Amino acid sequence: MKKLFSLVLAVAMVLSMACFASAEENTTLTIVAWDVGTTPYYQAQKEAFEATHPGVTIEYVDVASQDWDTKAGTMLSGGDTSDLFMVKQNINIMNWAQQGFAEPLTDYIAKDNYDLSGFVGMEPNYALDGTQYALPFRSDFWVLFYNKTLFDAAGVAYPTNDMTWEEYAALAKEMTGKGNCKYGCHYHTWLSAIVNFAVDDGKFTLLGGKYDEMKYFYDLALSLEDADACRKYTELTAAGLHYSGAFQTGDTAMMPMGYWYVATLINNIKNGLCDFEWGITALPHKEGVQAGSSFGNLTGIMINKKSEHKDLAWEYVSW
């Protein structure tokens, strides 16, 4: 989707887009994505694209986020003909391109003289050996979610925009066991939910070959596990517990997570799946690192080489 780098922009653009092209008639365009049912903007995009492309129906294949790498890879290797696949991690598109599953986009971009400037230099993340295999779909940064209801009940001040990781850990331990608060914090099972905080100093890079900076964050998470201030990684992986399920139980005080979760949380509260006051603040930071520092996640979209509607799929990608 063109210039969709945040949830707000995604929804705003699809609601304001006018019809500018006629698409194939009576065609179903299938998109494989994760957590469609808990991500409201997918429905908004479906409705907007269908409204501007009469005769086209968008159909989603919903895959649980924790099963994405295995499920999506199995579908592609099995010859699945779904038209579009979301790209959760850069390693996805690198593998899929090398395995011949991704349709090269370079010729489509050249044919339409498609302007890539709106991606502000992010599109090379999805290129391999000079060929573009996917385009950015969404970009998000990480924040700290917190349960205001639990903090209010405990009489403890909310987390702030200028809080060190040591202060965060102390606050998590303080909140643990107070009233209905069972856990002071929550770490999801993704690698990024631990190690990516190390890049917030603007110096360390995950591509540098040295990973000493990560140890601090591993040790911090393990210390919180040992203090029973967060759910244990082994228990989370065994149960397959989604981060939204963990936070929405209402017994967790804080959770570092991407900004995309805002729309899901609002929607789930609206639908009665949870009921508490909540807020967001900047991620904690290490001593000497500027307050408000964060890191981002990029989500991409690619055309399946087995798609039978490649031109229409490109129209969706470039829309």
Model-derived regions, located:
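Hinge/lid segment of periplasmic solute-binding proteins
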Residues: 88-141, 275-282
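Short, well-ordered beta-strand elements
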Residues: 25-36, 56-61, 83-84, 133, ...
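Short, polar/charged alpha-helical segment
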Residues: 36-57
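Extracytoplasmic/periplasmic substrate-recognition and gating elements
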Residues: 51, 57, 154, 269-319
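Short helix-initiation/N-cap motifs at beta->coil->alpha
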Residues: 62-71, 88-91, 163-169, 234-248
